[in-house]
Each structure stands twice: as structure tokens, then as C-alpha cells.
């Protein structure tokens, strides 16, 4: 199986991911037959897979197929067609994302206020987004994002590393955030930029120039 170091790997086909199935969607892969059958049942309203594919042809017999509770998470045929066609473009999408990420790397590598992903020619990164870490504690991500958006730069927070602050985890596990200092540090210091195939390379260079300019202006006002 692909893309995993465990029993199960999960892929998202949401509209902003590397490839999409028309807005929403996803895929689970596993080499564990029992897990596969349980997952299949869960996505198909709790149906028993074996019963479903060996259903009696006796029209007088009602096919009782549901052995458990499940969800209606079945992908549609049109979504599958979109996903299959997107797979043909995947290599090109990743190539373009790497080219765009390299522009970010070359433009930002000398900025001492940011930690950026290392560019390694021996590794092919998928670059869902280009995420940087703000290393200068005098530099507020909130102010930087606000200024960038005023300049028309599309950017988002770099993710949510502190998922233990979600209500479910708080009530279920009573997590102590002191046990996760790295996550606490990153939650307010990451910033992500788009690198997909719809982004013009000139615009990426412009984004980098605006980013560096705004960093310098914010820090200058701090001194």
C-alpha cells in the first residue's frame, strides 16, 4: 500500500488538495483485509461486503445485508471519473508545485526571521502549501497576516497543531498542553502560501517581495 507507515493511510480529495474529486472526497488504503472490510462496511451504511456481493437471486427473499451501523460515505460515479482523470495530471501538478516552492525558497532563504522548508533535489515533496515558521518572537503573525491581506496576498495559518484544544479531546482526554511545547510554539508562528498550478510564477515573486517588505516594516516599527 502507498503513502503510509502504519496499518491505514488516509488521503483527502477536498477542493484545495493536490487532486480533487469535485469538491469533497477522500480515500483510505490498507493491506489489512479485516480492516478493509470493516471500513468498506462503515462507508456503506453498515453492509456486510460478503453478503452484498453474494446476495440471493431468490426474489422472494429479502436481502438482509446490514450487520452494523455505518455512514453513507459512498463516492459517486461522477466523482470517481473526476478523480481518475485528475490522477493523470498528478505528476504535472506536483512538478509545478515544486517549481513554485523553489521560487519561495530562493526568495526567502536569506530572511533570518523565517524558518523555511529545506529544498532537497533528491526528494519530491507534494507541497500542499508552502509553510514557513516565524522565528522572530517580535514578529506577530496576526499583524503580518492582516498586512498581507491588505496587500491582496492570499495566506492562511499553517495548520492546527494543537488539536487537543478541540472540545472533544478536552472533555475526553483532559490533555495538559504543557506536555506539547512544540505544538504550543507552532500554533501562533506558522504561515502558509498557495503553490498550486493556478498560481502565476510572477505573482509568487511578488508575494515574496511583499512578505519581506511587510516583515521589515513591522520590525522597524517595533524598534
Q: Which residues make up each language-model segment?
A:
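Conserved active-site segment immediately N-terminal to the catalytic lysine
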Residues: 1-21, 62-66
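Acidic, glycine-centered active-site loop in nucleotide-sugar glycosyltransferases
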Residues: 5, 24, 130
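Alpha-helical hydrophobic/aromatic positions enriched in membrane-embedded helices and signal peptides
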Residues: 8, 23-24, 69, 188
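Conserved beta-strand->loop/alpha-helix structural units within folded catalytic cores of enzymes
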Residues: 21-22, 204
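PLP-dependent aminotransferase class I/II
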Residues: 31-223
Amino acid at each position: 500500500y502507498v503513502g503510509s507507515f502504519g496499518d491505514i493511510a488516509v488521503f483527502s480529495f477536498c477542493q484545495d488538495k493536490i487532486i480533487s474529486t469535485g469538491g469533497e472526497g477522500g480515500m483510505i488504503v490498507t493491506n489489512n483485509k479485516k480492516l478493509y472490510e470493516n471500513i468498506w462496511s462503515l462507508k456503506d451504511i453498515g453492509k456486510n461486503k460478503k453478503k452484498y456481493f453474494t446476495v440471493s437471486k431468490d426474489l422472494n427473499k429479502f436481502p438482509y445485508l446490514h450487520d452494523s451501523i455505518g455512514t453513507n460515505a459512498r463516492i459517486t460515479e461522477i466523482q470517481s471519473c473526476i478523480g481518475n482523470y485528475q490522477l493523470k495530471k498528478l505528476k504535472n501538478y506536483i512538478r509545478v508545485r515544486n517549481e513554485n516552492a523553489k521560487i519561495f525558497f530562493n526568495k526567502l532563504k536569506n530572511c533570518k526571521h523565517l524558518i523555511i522548508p529545506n529544498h532537497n533535489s533528491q526528494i519530491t515533496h507534494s507541497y500542499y502549501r508552502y509553510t514557513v515558521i516565524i522565528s522572530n518572537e517580535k514578529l506577530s503573525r496576526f499583524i503580518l497576516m492582516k498586512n498581507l491581506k491588505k496587500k491582496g496576498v492570499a495566506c492562511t495559518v499553517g495548520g492546527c497543531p494543537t488539536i487537543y484544544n478541540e472540545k472533544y479531546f478536552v472533555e475526553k482526554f483532559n490533555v495538559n498542553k504543557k506536555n506539547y511545547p512544540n505544538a504550543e510554539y507552532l500554533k501562533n508562528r506558522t504561515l502558509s502560501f498557495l503553490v498550486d498550478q493556478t498560481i502565476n510564477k510572477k505573482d509568487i515573486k511578488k508575494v515574496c517581495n511583499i512578505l519581506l517588505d511587510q516583515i521589515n516594516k513591522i520590525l522597524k516599527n517595533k524598534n
